[in-house]
């Protein structure tokens, strides 16, 4: 009986040493997984926001509630590509104050605003947010300086046309 008590005390000491050696690695793994999961979540939110912004930019012009057309701009106007992206990010629960939205044409004549694009012209919306604004653990184990997402679409702006005001007669 005495020997079992001595062995169990030695075993308890070995368990404590093993835990002291393994705990830092387990802690780093858990924190790394949490940070990687958050990074993946934010990346998915940015991808969705870029897609929503590209979808709006693809329209170029929209018909507002009064029946007149409204031009789609990147940074100004209502709605704008930037406001659509920021609203999508805010609805997901992230801060959107330092979000950067860029619009770039990939084909055809370069234009600076979505409403100036021609039908079928391909463009790219890039959304960037500083990772420090969205991470929940300030451990900075794997964290990049910023996260970026891109969405490519083609312009759906209608071809310009004129209406013949004189009707044909028989």
Where are these regions (language model features)?
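Alpha-helical transmembrane segments of integral membrane proteins
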Residues: 22-35
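N-terminal signal-anchor/signal peptide hydrophobic helix marking the start
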Residues: 11-25
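Transmembrane signal-anchor/signal-peptide helices with a preference for the extracytoplasmic
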Residues: 35-44
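Short, conserved structural patches
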Residues: 2-3, 43, 48, 52-170
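Conserved G/P- and acidic residue-centered "switch" motifs that form tight phosphate/ATP-binding loops
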Residues: 18, 35, 50
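Alpha-helical structural signal
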Residues: 17, 27-30, 42
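N-terminal leader/signal peptides at the extreme start of proteins
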Residues: 1-12
């Amino acid at each position: 009986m005495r020997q079992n008590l001595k062995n169990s005390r030695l075993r308890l000491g070995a368990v404590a040493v093993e835990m002291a050696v393994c705990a830092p690695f387990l802690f780093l793994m858990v924190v790394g997984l949490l940070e990687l999961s958050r990074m993946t979540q934010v990346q998915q939110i940015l991808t969705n926001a870029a897609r929503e912004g590209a979808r709006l930019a693809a329209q170029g012009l929209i018909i507002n509630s009064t029946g007149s057309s409204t031009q789609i701009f990147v940074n100004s106007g209502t709605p704008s590509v930037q406001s659509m992206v920021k609203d999508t990010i805010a609805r997901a629960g992230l801060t959107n104050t330092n979000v950067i939205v860029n619009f770039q044409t990939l084909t055809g004549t370069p234009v600076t605003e979505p409403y100036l694009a021609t039908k079928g012209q391909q463009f790219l919306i890039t959304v960037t947010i500083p990772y420090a604004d969205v991470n929940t653990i300030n451990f900075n184990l794997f964290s990049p300086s910023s996260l970026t997402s891109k969405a490519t679409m083609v312009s759906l702006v209608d071809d310009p046309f004129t209406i013949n005001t004189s009707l044909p007669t028989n």
